[in-house]
């Protein structure tokens, strides 16, 4: 229902804009961004994907363009000095391609005063620092945002509204923003079975100077459903109630449905002349074993030399390994439940990422709006913590491994 | 070889003239100007960074400001942003890409030429633009000078 209404809004607004464009050219601005990128990896087992929403991946002996290549078009229509419509449409690799799925943003922005602003419609997800621009590669030095932090962010946009307040001080500006809305996950299976997030509330506080910034964000939401696999496993666990008194309670823990999920992050950056140091720490948890407490983060050091930026980036995702026999000693493991026990552990492990990556890269600004980038990564994945990599088979069967990935990209805006 | 012999002095002169004009132009001071009727008398550097880098959208007196970028004069634009935030245009574009494509902020308005900027400053009381000092007319008010 939400999807349909936003498809209609996006279509109507786009139609109005195209018509208005002929009448008031200066009120309509068309711009965009894109990336043409390829990736290759030295592993068939732990293939690269930029986030969990992707079925396409880069593996050994081939060049994969789909995981990172995309193009986005943005329409900005000024209704008046204070009121604008913004529509953004991004074509990239994803399970479904239709107006709803490519509509990243479609909202009205109203500046009540220079300090107060409200926006309503489909807004870019603002969960962690780069969540709202993770596809805009020209905006950051790397080929992609760090997978360990952003690969698990469940959606690129949500439907709802936000209100923000900005207060300038002598040495910095204070920005406070609150959002309320709902949305669907990008995470999906071959059958396209997204998870719906209801009652999504987000608060962000940023202290911003030109030489430094500090941002704190917290988001809380309730998952409305399980994907099909998760629902089957939870239902199967509940059927153990005659043999184990804790089965129904544990089945609720297995399920994501009605679970409250928290996302919290702190980001900073600081410029020292040609150097920039930046980093982010994030924490995710819920009361379901499907999304167990996870620490993620990155630390980046960049050096700007003329049109060239050289950088080193360390990023990590850390979630404890889950063993059913330790967490639920009462779970009856026997011949007939052995397979179910494996599936429970798979549920508890597939979003429990445990890996770290060291990246070195170079960005060369060929023109004001065109950048060439090369990035080389070494990723150490831990057994049962490999969910960020695309692979065949179960996460619980995975072992420790080391993967190297090379990326080459052209990022542009227009 | 003959070509080089004949044209090398000419090339040297052209290069010298180009260097001279570049130096001459790069030495020309940039000022930030508003409409003559704007109440604002002076801005500090932080205020100009706020307005041109999308951090705040009003003058210190609370009135809405409209910063203007020039499209067809990369020399002036590049010199302005280098003086303002110490970044080349490619990095300024990267910075603005984040603000614009997240839908947070409307970027500066764009005028094509210096003549367009001049006209906009005359017509729009909220306009704020950067020009070479030699370009200031009696219909503009200088609110900031780069050293």
Short names for language-model regions:
Chain A
Residues 9-17:
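Bacterial N-terminal signal peptides
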Residues 17-24:
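Sec/Tat signal peptide C-region and signal peptidase I cleavage site
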Residues 24-52, 404-406:
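Transmembrane beta-strand segments of Gram-negative outer membrane beta-barrel proteins
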Residues 27-29, 35-40, 62-186, 197-201, ...:
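Outer membrane beta-barrel
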Residues 39-69, 190-191, 391-394:
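Surface-exposed strand-loop-strand hairpins of Gram-negative outer-membrane beta-barrel proteins
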Residues 41-45, 96-99, 127-133, 174, ...:
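Outer-membrane beta-barrel proteins
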Residues 43-45, 107, 235-414:
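Outer-membrane beta-barrel pore domains
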Residues 112-118, 154-304:
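Signature for the C-terminal beta-barrel architecture of outer-membrane proteins
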């Amino acid at each position: 229902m939400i999807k349909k209404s936003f498809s209609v809004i996006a279509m109507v607004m786009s139609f109005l804009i195209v018509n208005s464009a002929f009448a008031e050219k200066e009120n309509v601005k068309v711009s965009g961004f894109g990336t043409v990128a390829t990736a290759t990896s030295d592993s068939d087992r732990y293939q690269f994907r930029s986030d969990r929403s992707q079925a396409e991946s880069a593996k050994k002996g081939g060049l994969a363009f789909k995981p990172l290549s995309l193009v986005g078009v943005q329409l900005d229509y000024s209704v008046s000095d204070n009121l604008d419509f913004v529509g953004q449409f991004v074509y990239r690799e994803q399970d479904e391609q239709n107006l709803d799925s490519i509509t990243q943003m479609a909202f009205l922005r109203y500046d009540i005063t220079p300090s107060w602003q409200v926006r309503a419609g489909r807004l870019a997800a603002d969960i962690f620092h780069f969540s709202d621009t993770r596809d805009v590669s020209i905006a950051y030095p790397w080929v992609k945002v760090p997978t360990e932090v952003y690969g698990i962010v469940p959606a690129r946009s949500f439907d709802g509204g936000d209100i923000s307040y900005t207060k300038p001080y002598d040495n910095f500006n204070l920005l406070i923003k609150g959002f309320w809305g709902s949305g669907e996950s990008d995470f999906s299976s071959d059958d396209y079975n997204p998870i719906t997030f209801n009652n999504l509330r987000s608060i962000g506080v940023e202290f911003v100077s030109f030489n430094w910034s500090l941002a704190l964000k917290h988001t809380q939401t309730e998952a409305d459903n399980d994907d099909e696999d998760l629902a089957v496993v939870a239902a199967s666990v509940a059927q153990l109630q005659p043999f184990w008194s804790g089965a129904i309670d544990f089945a609720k823990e297995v399920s994501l449905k009605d679970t409250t999920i928290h996302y919290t992050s702190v980001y900073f950056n600081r410029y020292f002349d040609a150097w920039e140091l930046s980093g982010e720490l994030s924490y995710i948890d819920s009361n379901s074993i499907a999304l167990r407490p996870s620490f993620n983060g990155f630390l980046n050091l960049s050096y700007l030399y003329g049109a060239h930026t050289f950088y080193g980036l360390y990023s990590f995702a850390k979630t404890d390994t889950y063993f059913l026999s330790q967490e639920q000693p009462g779970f009856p493991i026997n011949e007939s439940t052995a397979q179910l026990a494996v599936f429970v552990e798979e549920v508890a492990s597939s979003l429990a990422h445990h890996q770290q990556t060291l990246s070195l890269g170079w960005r060369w600004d060929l023109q004001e709006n065109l950048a060439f980038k090369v990035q080389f990564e070494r990723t150490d994945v831990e057994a049962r913590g490999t969910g960020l990599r695309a692979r065949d088979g179960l996460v619980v069967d995975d072992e420790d491994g080391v993967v190297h990935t090379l990326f080459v990209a052209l990022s542009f805006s227009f | 070889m003959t070509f080089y012999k004949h044209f090398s002095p000419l090339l040297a002169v052209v290069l010298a003239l180009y260097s001279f004009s570049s130096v001459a132009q790069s030495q020309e001071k940039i000022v930030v100007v508003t409409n003559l009727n704007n109440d604002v008398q002076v801005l500090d550097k932080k205020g100009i960074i706020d307005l041109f880098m999308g951090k705040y959208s009003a003058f210190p007196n609370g009135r809405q400001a409209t910063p203007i970028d020039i499209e067809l004069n990369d020399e002036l634009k590049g010199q302005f942003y280098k003086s303002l935030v110490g970044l080349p245009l490619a990095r300024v574009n990267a910075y603005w890409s984040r603000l614009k494509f997240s839908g947070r902020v409307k970027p500066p308005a764009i005028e094509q030429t210096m003549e367009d900027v001049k006209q906009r400053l005359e017509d729009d009381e909220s306009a704020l633009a950067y020009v070479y000092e030699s370009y200031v007319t009696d219909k503009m008010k200088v609110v900031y000078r780069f050293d």
